[in-house]
Amino acid sequence: MISQAYPLLSSIHSPADLKKLSLHELELVAAECRKKVIELVSQNGGHFGSSLGVVELTVALHYVYQSPTDRIIWDVGHQAYVHKILTGRLAQMETNRRYHGLAGFPKRSESPHDAFGTGHASTSISAAAGLAAARDLAGRKEKVVAIIGDGSLTGGMAFEAMNHLGDTKSDVLVILNDNQMAISPSTGGLKNYLVNLTLNKTYNRLRKFVWDSLSLLHNEIGETAKTAVHRIEDGIKAAFTPGAYFEALGFRYFGPIDGHNMEQLIKALREMRQLHHPKLLHVITTKGKGFKPAEENQPKWHASVGGFDIETGKNVKAPGKPAKPKYQEVFGEALVELALKDPTITAITAAMPSGTSLDLFQQAIPSRCFDVGIAEQHAVTFAAGLACGGFKPVFAVYSTFLQRAYDQLIHDVALQNLHVVFAIDRAGLVGEDGPTHHGAFDLSYLNVVPNLTIMAPGDEQELRNMLYTALYDIKGPVAIRYPRGSGSGATLHKEFTPVPVGRGRILRDGKSVALLGIGTMSNRALETAALLEAAGLDPLVCDMRFLKPLDTEIIDMAASRCTHIVTIEENSIIGGFGSNVVNYLHHAHPGIKCISFGLPDAFVTHGSMDELYREVGLDAESLSGKILEFYKDKP
């Protein structure tokens, strides 16, 4: 029972219930929240370290502020589990990241306490600025708070928003959750004195009095005096705290303070409520706080893909299933193999070295591996510069995050026909992370870009071969898309074999209906063909490999043998592989019947891969049933 395991937490049905508690009871609530997050992620997986790091901050925020009237926005949303627990969703947390359960990120349709949906980094301050502008235009008085991590502050969008907010003078609080992964806090007794000073009510009242008094002076004298006083204040802060930069953007800076000290957090947040201009509160937290393995290895425990043993911290693996190599690992190892022999190969990541397996490159050849932070736009143009300088840059990036650099891909890379390789990870569905992280659109948004070669491997060995081909057999920009997680278990060969550019391959000969798959959906086509064969059909199965250039010869062959052609892709049904095939058939073989299967024109929810494939109709059983119905319609 929840009430027995979490006696205080089970009595919290909304943030209003927190306001009845003493400081000691709030600290007990925080301890129960931390215990619940550890238990939850050990069972369901999910983002772990960030949520443990903001437990006290979340409790203090909901104690001081009035959610959902006050708007609280969590950047990225990795750290929002405790927020969900405290806003009436404790009993539902067992369903977190599960099919038809709670989302792993803030979601407006899930709760009025989720003021803004997130999943990608660096968006919170822009959203807060918009919410504050809407409040001011409507004449309302609610508070707006954005919580952003130091990693997300490497994204240019965050600084664009701060630059704008500082100019508007709007009442917004930005909380910098600094878990010391990117920004190093200053130390020392004088720093602590200044922290206490900036949060002191008397200091802030005196500061306001001095400012108001200077405003009464003659304009020229008053402004001169203000400038002098401001410079003195800024100089002292700049010497002992990292706040000068934020003050230059128009924010009052407070901190840094201990993000695990409930009393200090509440004091600071109460003071923030009294200030009616842009302000930034710098909070120092420990990622993974309260779980020793996560504190000792923060990058590893950023998220847990599956369950783990709470006592040992070791992953719990399903019995009897030998591990197959992951596409990410195969890519990372292959790139290192090639780069050790070729000094012109460079690797680029946007703050995702471990997720993309570029950490292998970092360890082997650190001088040629560049982590640019959460800055995909910069990463792409940086890669373009490397290509202009005679190097072969490989930018490894999740499909959903490459969307953020679309202009740079077109304008800075493709337009100049530069040899940049885009290794597009997490293409297709990604499971429990859901719609913010599915790679559902890359074939579509890349399809229209001139000069770009686009390919998708059907297995791990194909990925190795395509990487080699992209680096040595193609002169312009290249995109290779591959899915998350384990491969098919294909035999890996040490040598690299070039893939003929623009050529597919026949996986199964046949003549009744042609199944054209791209990427790992070619394997799904084979599974489907087995079911169709049992139903009396003789399917032709082709792995098309390339979206651009499209292998029209293999399509011509299929059209000459079969009356029906089926395309299968793990990408939006609009504008991708199927669209290209249908367009070609319309002009070259107008009598051939064709049907396309892919992801629907909708945002696919979260859940296990099997559950999601069934929902969108990309499992072999659903496909075979629909194809049999389609085949009954003779031309």
Curated annotation (Swiss-Prot):
Sites where the protein binds thiamine diphosphate: H78, G119, H120, A121, G151, S152, N179, F291, E376
EC supergroup of this enzyme: transferase
Listed name of the protein: 1-deoxy-D-xylulose-5-phosphate synthase
Function noted in UniProt: Catalyzes the acyloin condensation reaction between C atoms 2 and 3 of pyruvate and glyceraldehyde 3-phosphate to yield 1-deoxy-D-xylulose-5-phosphate (DXP).
CDD domains in alphabetical order: TPP_DXS, TPP_PYR_DXS_TK_like
UniProt-listed PROSITE patterns: TRANSKETOLASE_1, TRANSKETOLASE_2
Organism whose genome encodes this protein: Chlorobaculum tepidum (strain ATCC 49652 / DSM 12025 / NBRC 103806 / TLS) (Chlorobium tepidum)
EC id: 2.2.1.7
Gene designation per UniProt: dxs
Subunit structure, as described in the record: Homodimer.
Entry keywords, A to Z: Isoprene biosynthesis, Magnesium, Metal-binding, Thiamine biosynthesis, Thiamine pyrophosphate, Transferase
Reactions performed catalytically: D-glyceraldehyde 3-phosphate + pyruvate + H(+) = 1-deoxy-D-xylulose 5-phosphate + CO2
UniProt-listed InterPro entries: Dxylulose-5-P_synthase (IPR005477), THDP-binding (IPR029061), Transketo_C/PFOR_II (IPR009014), Transketolase-like_Pyr-bd (IPR005475), Transketolase_BS (IPR020826), Transketolase_C (IPR033248), Transketolase_CS (IPR049557)
Pathway membership, UniProt: Metabolic intermediate biosynthesis; 1-deoxy-D-xylulose 5-phosphate biosynthesis; 1-deoxy-D-xylulose 5-phosphate from D-glyceraldehyde 3-phosphate and pyruvate: step 1/1
One GO term describing the cellular component: cytosol
Family: Belongs to the transketolase family. DXPS subfamily.
Gene3D superfamilies linked: 3.40.50.920, 3.40.50.970
Residues at which Mg(2+) binds: D150, N179
Record-linked NCBIfam families: dxs, PRK05444.2-2
Cofactor: Mg(2+); thiamine diphosphate
Cofactor binding notes: Binds 1 Mg(2+) ion per subunit.
UniProt GO MF annotations: 1-deoxy-D-xylulose-5-phosphate synthase activity; magnesium ion binding; thiamine pyrophosphate binding
GO biological process, one term: isopentenyl diphosphate biosynthetic process, methylerythritol 4-phosphate pathway
